[in-house]
Regions:
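Conserved ABC transporter NBD signature motif
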Residues: 64-72
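ABC-type ATPase nucleotide-binding domains, specifically the catalytic core motifs of the NBD
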Residues: 14-18, 109-121
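Short coil-to-helix segment of the ABC ATPase nucleotide-binding domain corresponding to the Q-loop/switch region
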Residues: 99-110
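ABC ATPase NBD coupling module
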Residues: 19-22, 73-90
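Helix-to-loop junction immediately C-terminal to a conserved catalytic motif
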Residues: 56
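Conserved ABC nucleotide-binding domain
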Residues: 75-78, 129-144
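A short, flexible loop at the N-terminus of ABC-type nucleotide-binding domains that lies
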Residues: 3, 12-27
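The feature captures the beta-strand-to-loop junction immediately N-terminal to the Walker
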Residues: 41-43
Length: 149
């Protein structure tokens, strides 16, 4: 069974000046099975970022479906989309995108705080990861000399 299905996905942008329409995605369909790895490749301007923004529920398509684990994410209401992203999606950015004014530990537990996990559970779960980073846990990311990428 596919964990991700994209059916006839379409995205059209309308330019601000002149109202011209630009088709970024046109009837794109594919599926991803559990355990598969997928690479998205293409020329600049070919729609890669548009596709990823739609798959991440950061943008809405003009048409089509995006079904993740059996749920069409296009139909998720605006007030529920943040919780859906937090509970079902993971992002791996090219850059770290961590909060400079937080310690590394604070950055790690932030998703748990946003999910309403109680303090004791947060500590327990974060320690599983933090033990590997013990020597830099309380450093601030703004101090670039002390925290190596």
């Amino acid at each position: 069974m596919a964990i991700l299905e994209v059916n006839n996905l379409k995205k059209v942008y309308t330019t601000r000046l002149g109202g011209n329409q630009v088709e970024a995605l046109k009837n794109l369909s594919f599926s991803v099975e559990e355990g598969e790895y997928v690479a998205i490749m293409g020329e600049s301007g070919s729609g890669k970022t548009t596709l990823l923004n739609i798959l991440a529920a950061l943008d809405k398509p003009t048409g089509g479906q995006v079904i993740l684990n059996g749920k069409n994410i296009v139909d998720i209401r605006e007030k529920e989309i943040s919780a859906f992203r937090r509970e079902n999606l993971g992002f791996v950015f090219q850059d770290f995108n961590l909060l400079d004014n937080f310690s590394l530990k604070d950055n790690i537990v932030l998703p748990l705080v946003l999910s309403g996990v109680d303090y004791k559970e947060m500590e327990r779960r974060s320690l599983e990861f933090l033990i590997f980073l013990e020597n830099i846990l309380m450093k601030y990311l703004a101090d670039r000399n002390s925290v190596r990428r």
